[in-house]
Regions:
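Residue-identity detector for glycine
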Residues: 11, 23, 68, 73, ...
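A conserved regulatory-domain signal marking ACT and ACT-like small-molecule sensing domains
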Residues: 96-194
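Catalytic, metal-anchored helix/loop core of enzyme active sites in primary metabolism
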Residues: 45-132
Length: 194
């Protein structure tokens, strides 16, 4: 179990036209992506962050009220599940399923949990991120380990750089300004789901 406050989450409520234009120029789409990833035999990480998704990724074509889930396993490589995840009928179906499970005292079993070593949660990984801002002093807030690209203009500015996930987690409240948008540019998890 990982407490929700220890997981970095960042949404798309501050996305701007300039972010969408940038994505189109790079032939990618911006998707809100939740990831749980085995970093090593001893560690895993998880986060929710907008991501630049290339056409080669399964989730590139997931639009509107649909959700997509990619699962990678040692024995079966990759599986992709796709379906409606929002709207009145999918939501009602999920609620009804939960109510029926509760009424019938159904509980999930986690048999492997008792004999497998549980990996530890870590935020000690590096992400490559795009941070667009207008007025917020992003460089004064975030400590990038490397800056790859910077752009400034009257309308908006952005920086692309490497940063520790732990740094994003520690500074997330200071990034909640309405003029800041953050997106992952997959490098650490490259080729995890294509």
């Amino acid at each position: 179990y990982v407490a929700p406050e220890k997981i970095f989450t960042y949404g798309i409520s501050t996305i701007h036209d300039s972010d969408i234009r940038y994505a189109r120029e790079k032939n990618v789409k911006i998707k809100l992506v939740a990831q749980v990833v085995k970093v090593s035999d001893e560690h895993f990480t998880m986060f929710v962050i907008p991501e630049f998704v290339t056409p080669s990724k399964y989730i590139y074509s997931v639009d509107d009220e649909y959700n997509g889930v990619v699962i990678r396993g040692e024995c079966y490589d990759r599986q992709f599940m796709f379906g409606k995840g929002a709207g009145s009928l999918p939501t009602a179906s999920s609620i009804l399923s939960d109510i029926m499970a509760r009424l019938n005292n159904y509980r999930y079993e986690y048999k492997k949990q008792n004999y497998m070593q549980k990996p530890d949660y870590t935020t000690d990984i590096t992400l490559k991120v795009y941070v667009r801002y207008k007025e917020t002093d992003v460089h004064g807030i975030l400590n990038f380990t490397k800056v790859h690209e910077q752009y400034t203009s009257e309308d908006s500015n952005y920086v692309i750089g490497d940063i520790q996930l732990s740094e994003l987690l520690a500074k997330r409240d200071r990034l909640r300004g309405k003029d800041v948008f953050l997106a992952n540019i997959p490098i650490f998890f490259l080729n995890r789901d294509n």
